[in-house]
């Protein structure tokens, strides 16, 4: 066989190296979303201040320089900004809420720096983030965690710039976790009924994470 032909054959038989899709998980916390994406072959880059989060970057997002990622294509951003100062149950001040607003704005700045890839921002629906006007340009979806396998409802808002729509309708107190029109558990620490640790309450249902990861994987 001629040398030139051999070179062509070798070139055509070489396997193409395909770079993995990448998720940037901001305020990664329990890593619920990251695990779902990793299970589908994605590379996950995470940012959080909590050492328990075992994030790629253990840093305050307000001080984190995302320029180190400019050489890498980020395919999806997920963010779960702290909800404490937005909580209706907490006696937070307007100054507290303004501090939290800065983190949400920083999230949007990072997304813009990275080319505004598909993005999801999650926060409890009972909180006040929805009243701050920061995410009005994004599609708002509501989910109830009980319809995705959790024992409590915990209605949650997910803002996105994608076409994703939850597959499960909102609960009408008729889900598998309801008895006689009431949920058997509440998303709370202490009090009557089952009690959950703070880390457990911060978890995002695996079924919901898988659904979003599958949607993003379809491109």
Where are the model-predicted features located?
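Conserved active-site and SAM-binding loop architecture
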Residues: 1-219
